[in-house]
Design a protein with these regions (language model features):
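Secretory targeting signals
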Residues: 24-64, 89-161
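Hydrophobic alpha-helical transmembrane segments
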Residues: 1-49, 140-144, 156-208
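Perimembrane helix-loop junctions in membrane proteins
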Residues: 69, 113-114, 147, 198-201
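Juxtamembrane loop-helix boundary motifs flanking transmembrane segments in multi-pass membrane proteins
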Residues: 1-5, 83-84, 116
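A generic alpha-helix surface/boundary motif
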Residues: 4, 69-70, 135
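Helix-loop-helix units of permease transmembrane domains in multi-pass membrane transporters
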Residues: 62-95
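Secondary-structure boundary/capping residues
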Residues: 15, 19, 76, 84, ...
Length: 208
């Protein structure tokens, strides 16, 4: 995978999709920093908790747009690049942006002790793991459904699962992020095989 190929896919996605997670992470860090300076620690952490969820949703939406926003995406199957290569490259670009945004968000808030349930530098695994999970959810849904609306719904569902059903009750970080990431790795295998099915990829173009 050449640098020219990656740059070409980056241009297709556009600066908003590529920079969206980083900008969201920076905004959360800035607001959290101000809150930590002006409010009691408990109130600042509560605000950061909710703002961090906005960052995860923003990253997931960027992934959904990246993976479904091109109406001619499946036509790459008729070229030497292949549909799977295109989708995995685009998912990878959003993931890198999301991981960067998570770092931009976490480390300043960790420095001012405004990050909730902070267990040290390793706590960065919480937002970075969430990024990977929602991107995999977007990639999986885009691979099998292919529509922007369904993919966005899947991203929101993955976020709701983490924010409301998983993270509040599974506090040890290795289990909190390790188990969903193991499941995500298994789902990536299914995505790999589905995106490699040239007949289904071409059939999607024919039926559109």
């Amino acid at each position: 995978m050449t640098g020219a190929w990656i740059r070409a896919q980056g241009r297709q996605l556009g600066p908003i999709v590529l920079a969206g997670p980083i900008l969201a992470g920076g905004a959360v860090a800035l607001l959290g920093w101000f809150a930590a300076d002006a409010w009691p620690p408990s109130q600042a952490m509560t605000l950061v908790t909710w703002l961090a969820q906005v960052f995860v949703i923003a990253t997931g939406v960027c992934a959904a747009v990246a993976l479904t926003g091109d109406p001619l995406l499946e036509l790459h199957e008729s070229t030497p690049t292949g549909f799977r290569r295109v989708q995995l490259t685009r998912a990878g670009l959003v993931t890198v942006s999301g991981l960067s945004g998570a770092a931009v968000m976490f480390f300043p808030l960790h420095a001012v002790r405004a990050w909730p349930h902070d267990q040290g530098w390793s706590t960065v695994a919480s937002p970075t793991g969430a990024v990977v999970i929602v991107v995999v959810a977007a990639l999986l849904t885009a691979a099998f459904a292919g529509t922007a609306s369904t993919t966005t719904i899947a991203v929101v569902a993955a976020w709701m699962f983490l924010a409301m059903l998983w993270d509040p009750y599974v506090l040890p970080l290795p289990q909190q992020r390790g188990i969903p990431l193991i499941v995500s790795a298994g789902l990536l295998v299914a995505v790999w095989h589905r995106l490699g099915d040239a007949e289904r990829n071409i059939a999607k173009v024919v039926t559109v």
